[in-house]
Amino acid sequence: MATPSLIPTDADRDHPVRIHRVTRTNRHLWYQLTVLQQPERARACGAGTKDSDRRPVDPPPVVELRIKEGNSFEEGKEITFDYNANFFLYASLEQSRRIAPGRMQGQPNPPILTGSPVSGMAYLDRPAAAGYFIFPDLSVRHEGHYRLSFSLFETTKDEKDLDIERASDDRLDTGADWRMEIKTSPFDVFSAKKFPGLMESTPLSKEVADQGCHVRIRRDVRMRKRDAKSNNGRDRREDDMARRRTVTPASEDPHSAAARARSMSNSSEHRVPGPPEPPGHPSAVDPAGRGHLSFGGPQYASPHQYGLQSRLPPPSPGGPYNPATQYIKPEHQSYRYPPSRDMSQTGPSPAPRQDGHDRRQSGPYVPPSPSVYSNDGRSRPESHPSYPSTPVSSHPANLPSDPSLVLPRIKSPSNSVSPSNSSLKITDLLVQPLPSSEPKLEVGSAPCPPPKTPIGSKRKHDQTFVQNDRALRNHQRQLDPHYNPVARPCSPVGEQYKRADGTYMYAKFSVFTM
C-alpha cells in the first residue's frame, strides 16, 4: 500500500504524480499519473430543464497512467499492459481556492458537476504505449473558478499483487483500493452570455479518437465562426442602410406628377392666379376706377384689387391696419344704389391669361349680390380667392333715361391697384339701376362690392343679410333696405322683380297674340 508521505499534496501541479507500492511477493511497483490535456473553459449548464442544453468541459481532460516494476521508476520495467488489474479514475470538482470552514456548519451544497465523472482505462499505442483516462462528457452547472481532482482506484485480480499489509487475509477483497490523486490546473466556467465559444479539437483528442475512443471532434473553430457570422450580419445591415440612404427616386413623368398634384388638391375649383405682369404693361381698367361706383375714402381700396389680394397673406388679428395692402370687405355701409355707366371712360381690355389646365373660362358666370351691411368693423380674409371669368353677356344693360335716379360718380383714390390679368370690362360690372320716384338719400360712404364668388361655391349669409353695428340714438332703428319703404318701394312696379339682396331688376316678357 502506498505510504501517506508519497501522496501528493500540491494542488498547482502540472508534473506527473508517482507512488511506490510493495506487493506480497516483494515486487516493487511504481505508478505515475500525468494530465496530458488540461481543461481550459466550460459553459455553465444550469440545473433542471436547462441541463439538457449543456456544454462539456473544453478540451476534454486526458490522464495518462504508466506502471513500472523495479527499484526506481527510471530503472524500472514497463508493465502497464502486462499488469493484471482493473483501474478507473473518478473526477470531482472543487474550488480553485480553498475556503476556510466557518464556525457554524453550513448547508451542504448540491452537486455542481454533471455528466460522466468516471472513466475506465483505455490501452492505447499513441501517443505512447500506456493507459489513458478520457473524460469527454463533464459539465459544470454554475459559473466560477474551479479545478478537477482525479482519484485512481485499482481492483486487484491476483493474490500476489495484493499489498504486503494484507498477507494474513487469504481471500481477495472484492472492493477497490484507492491508489493516488492528481489535480488539474484551474479553469473558468462562464455563463451562457459570457462564454467565448468552443475551440477546435486538439491534436491529442483527434489522435485518441482515431484509435476508437469516444471523443467528439470539431473540425472548425466555433468561436471564430460565431464572430464571423455576427460580423457578416452587421456588415449586411450596414450595407442595407447605406443602400437605403443612397437610393435615388425613380424619374416620373411631369405630366402625371402635375395631374396627381391636381387630383390630390382640394382647390380644383379655386386656382391661384399667375404672377402680376410687369408695371409697363397697359392696364385694362382705368386706375382711377371712374367706371365703377366707389365712395371715396382712404379706408376703402379700389374694387380692382381683388386679383392682387388673393395672393396676399391674410391680415393678422392684432396687427396694424394697412389700407394700401389689405382688402376690406364692405363695412359700415348705408344704402346701396346702382352705379352709373360711362362708356367713354372704358378702355380696351387685353386678352386674358390662359391656364393650361383651366377649362372653366367658357362656362357662364353669375356675379353675386353684394352685402348691404357688415356685422363688425374688423376685416376678415376671404375664404376663397376670386378669379375673373367670362360674364354671361358682354352687352350693356338698358339704363333708365331719367338722370335724376343715378348718383354722381365718385372717384376712387389714386393709389388703387388694378390686376393686370383681369379680363372684365367696366360695363360687365355694372348693375341695372332702380327707377324710383323716391327722393335720393344722403349717404356718408358706400364701399365697393365684394369679390365675385367663383363657380361651385355659395354666397355666405352675412354677405347678403347683414345688420349694421352702428350706435342707434334718439329712438333710431336699423335701416333695412328689404323692409324700409323710404329706401325702396315695398312692391315692384311694372315689369320689375325684387332679388334676395333687395335690388330690383327689369323683367322682359314675350308677348303672345292669339
Swiss-Prot record:
Record-given protein name: Developmental and secondary metabolism regulator veA
Reported function: Component of the velvet transcription factor complex that controls sexual/asexual developmental ratio in response to light, promoting sexual development in the darkness while stimulating asexual sporulation under illumination. The velvet complex hat acts as a global regulator for secondary metabolite gene expression. Controls the expression of the cephalosporin C gene cluster. Regulates hyphal fragmentation.
- Entry-linked Gene3D superfamilies: Velvet domain
Task: Name the segments for region: Disordered.
Answer: 219-463
For the null mutant, the annotation states: Reduces by 80% cephalosporin C production and leads to an altered hyphal morphology.
Ranges of Basic and acidic residues composition bias in the record: 228-243
Q: Where is this region: PEST?
A: 411-448
Subunit details for this protein? Component of the heterotrimeric velvet complex composed of laeA, veA and velB; VeA acting as a bridging protein between laeA and velB.
Which PANTHER family does the entry mention?
A: DEVELOPMENTAL AND SECONDARY METABOLISM REGULATOR VEA (PTHR33572:SF14), SPORE DEVELOPMENT REGULATOR VOSA (PTHR33572)
Chain intervals with Low complexity compositional bias: 256-267, 412-423
Give the main location: nucleus
Which keywords are on file for this protein?
A: Cytoplasm, Nucleus, Sporulation, Transcription, Transcription regulation
Q: Where is this motif: Nuclear localization signal?
A: 40-45
Skewed-composition ranges (Polar residues): 386-396
